[in-house]
């Protein structure tokens, strides 16, 4: 049996490497859980049992083993398989995934509603330290939900290295493997004793020893039965343990030690790089050369500012490298704080730093700052604290799909009092925005960064808060563009002129506050006014302009060029922008329809 399963694992690993090398994706996490997922498939019934993966980035093997093997080479491509779990894609996917901390709370709901079905939750050693996960564990143990099996995949990594007490705790658990066997022997011995008095005395002694010498007592005191596999990529060790815990009444926690990137030498050597990777050469492990990103521009500039001002602190929630903070973290480790997957904690921590006279920069992806809206309002806005927020991956992100697109943050930042919001349109404006941020003490400041290559224009005027800049001057049609949309409208500027559409193009990096002077004194002279933004159209930049014009008695029709739908699928960023009629010929046709009522 183990020989057949080993061969299956080898075939799956080969498939993973081949497909991810072409499409990009989460290679390291999936290589690490091949044996675990194959053994789960062997022991449990995926049609009857409810299997949940926290985050879902490590569920590629699960997709292959269920009903998607033939389509696996389409993963992360437009209209292909989703990069995460999606109930619309397969009946085997019970809950949408993408963010950390969702699987255990959802498992509680499934377990209560389906008491006769086994609920299996695979959660990473980083995700389990997330507040939502811990809240769910607390409830599961308290209610003694017997049909839940929690499998903690311990590979000692999230995207980067794990941080915090719980990570250290799990390492201690792994190192305590010998005691687990001793504990089982002691329990077996106690259970064979007939004299109740002696039995109770030995049970108290066992609990006392356990509390002093092992970390198991903490888990068991929460109501869990605990088991441990220290060689999680060894089928002969893993399979018997899964069979053992299958029919146990729980709740049960099984800690499985795996190796991230297992079976591909480059992924084993560079675990962080291969956590989530762009297409790469299998023979060398090298990705294909990309242009400079806005995240890199930010990383270089914040390092420069950090050298100038020792009060600057940077914070990220398990995204040090992804947000461009790697150089800063190397140069100033004591001023670069990685909170782990704990966005709300990061925001309130930054508020404490700001309250103490420091200059905190919270660097988080747009999709993840959603998880800290309460802290943004309660801990930052109400106190009007000068916390700087660098919101990376704003707008459409592409292949990671609907759970990762950054299309909501602008809407809620515009709604929260005291926030200033900047959407730089060029890399120079980003650098200028960061320079301004260093001594900005008027309240919280947001700087949005897209997942895009950098763009610049010649003879660019300096960025000013509350002021916009005319880039092209026309007479009939006004285009007010923020963020990435300046680059996009300038790309079609010549073609618009060729089609008889005269254009004034305004660069609007300052989204909040608006350039009220421009709106009051210049907007009336244009026949058609377009506001372009890469954000969900509801409560957006264009909404703010409409509200301002209405409040000042200015009656003008505003054409809103934005994302019409809140849920954007996965695919290449360029493809999705064109589908949304936000780029190229599709945008030109959209503009023509708005001006002429039809395509010209």
For each of these PLM feature ranges, what is it?
Residues 74-106, 112-116, 142-273, 289-291, ...:
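Thiamine diphosphate
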Residues 1-19, 266-282:
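Cofactor-/ligand-binding subdomain signature composed of acidic, glycine-rich
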Residues 18, 25-146, 311-312, 317, ...:
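Cofactor-binding active-site loop characterized by glycine-rich and histidine/acidic residues
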Residues 139, 218, 328, 352-353, ...:
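Hydrophobic/aromatic ligand-binding patch that stacks against planar heteroaromatic rings
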Residues 31, 53-55, 123-124, 152-154, ...:
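Glycine-rich, histidine-containing beta strand-loop boundary motifs that form or position
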Residues 279, 414-458:
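Helix-enriched interaction subdomains in cytosolic or periplasmic regions
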Residues 119, 123-124, 128, 132-136, ...:
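Extended, hydrophobic alpha-helical segments in both membrane/secreted and soluble proteins
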Residues 22-26, 123-127, 228-235, 364-369, ...:
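Conserved short loop/turn motifs at secondary-structure junctions
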């Amino acid at each position: 049996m183990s020989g057949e399963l080993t061969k299956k694992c080898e075939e799956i690993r080969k498939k993973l490497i081949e497909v991810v090398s072409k499409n990009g994706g989460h290679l390291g996490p999936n290589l690490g859980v091949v044996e675990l997922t194959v053994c789960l498939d062997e022991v449990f019934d995926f049609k009857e049992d409810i299997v949940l993966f926290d985050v879902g980035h490590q569920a590629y093997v699960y997709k292959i083993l269920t009903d998607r093997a033939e389509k696996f080479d389409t993963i992360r491509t437009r209209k292909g398989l989703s990069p995460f779990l999606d109930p619309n894609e397969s009946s085997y996917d019970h809950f949408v995934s993408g963010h950390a901390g969702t699987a255990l709370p959802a498992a509680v709901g499934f377990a209560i509603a389906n008491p006769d079905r086994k609920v299996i939750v695979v959660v990473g050693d980083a995700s389990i330290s997330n507040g939502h996960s811990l809240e769910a564990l607390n409830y599961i143990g308290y209610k003694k939900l017997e049909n839940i099996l929690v499998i903690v995949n311990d590979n000692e990594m999230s995207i980067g290295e794990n941080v915090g007490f719980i990570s250290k705790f799990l390492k201690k658990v792994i190192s305590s493997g010998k005691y687990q066997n001793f504990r089982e022997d002691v329990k077996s011995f106690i259970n064979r004793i007939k004299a109740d008095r002696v039995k109770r005395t030995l049970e108290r002694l066992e609990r006392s020893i356990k509390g002093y010498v092992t970390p198991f007592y903490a888990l068991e005191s929460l109501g869990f039965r605990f088991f441990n596999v220290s060689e999680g990529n060894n089928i002969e060790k893993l399979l018997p343990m899964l069979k053992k815990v299958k029919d146990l009444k729980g709740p049960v926690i099984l800690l499985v030690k795996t190796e991230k990137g297992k079976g591909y030498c480059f992924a084993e050597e560079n675990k962080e790089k291969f956590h989530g990777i762009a297409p790469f050469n299998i023979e060398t492990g090298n990705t294909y050369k990309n242009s400079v990103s806005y995240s890199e521009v930010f990383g270089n500039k914040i390092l420069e500012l950090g050298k100038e001002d020792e009060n600057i602190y940077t914070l990220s929630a398990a995204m040090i490298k992804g947000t461009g903070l790697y150089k800063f973290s190397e140069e100033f480790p004591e001023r670069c704080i990685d909170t782990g997957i704990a966005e709300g904690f990061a925001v309130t921590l930054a508020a404490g730093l700001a309250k103490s006279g420091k200059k905190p920069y919270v660097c988080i992806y747009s999709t993840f700052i959603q998880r800290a809206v309460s802290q943004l309002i309660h801990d930052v806005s109400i106190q009007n604290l000068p916390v700087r927020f660098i919101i990376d991956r704003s707008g459409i992100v592409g292949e990671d799909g609907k759970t990762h697109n950054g299309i909501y943050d602008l809407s809620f930042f515009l709604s929260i009092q005291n926030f200033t919001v900047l959407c730089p349109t060029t890399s120079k404006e980003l650098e200028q925005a960061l320079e301004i941020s260093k001594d900005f003490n008027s309240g919280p400041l947001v700087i949005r960064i897209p997942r895009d290559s950098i763009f610049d224009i010649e003879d660019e005027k300096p960025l000013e808060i509350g002021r916009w800049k005319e880039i092209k001057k026309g007479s009939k049609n006004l285009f007010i563009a923020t963020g990435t949309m300046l680059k996009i409208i300038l790309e079609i500027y010549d073609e618009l002129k060729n089609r008889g559409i005269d254009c004034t193009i305004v660069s609007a990096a300052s989204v909040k506050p608006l350039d009220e002077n421009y709106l009051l004194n210049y907007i009336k002279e244009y026949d058609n006014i377009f506001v372009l933004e890469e954000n969900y159209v509801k409560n957006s930049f264009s909404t703010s302009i409409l509200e301002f014009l209405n409040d000042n008695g200015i009656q003008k029709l505003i054409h809103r060029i934005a994302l019409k739908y809140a849920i954007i699928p996965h695919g290449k960023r360029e493809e999705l922008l064109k589908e949304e009629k936000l780029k190229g010929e599709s945008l030109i046709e959209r503009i023509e329809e708005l001006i002429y009522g039809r395509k010209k």
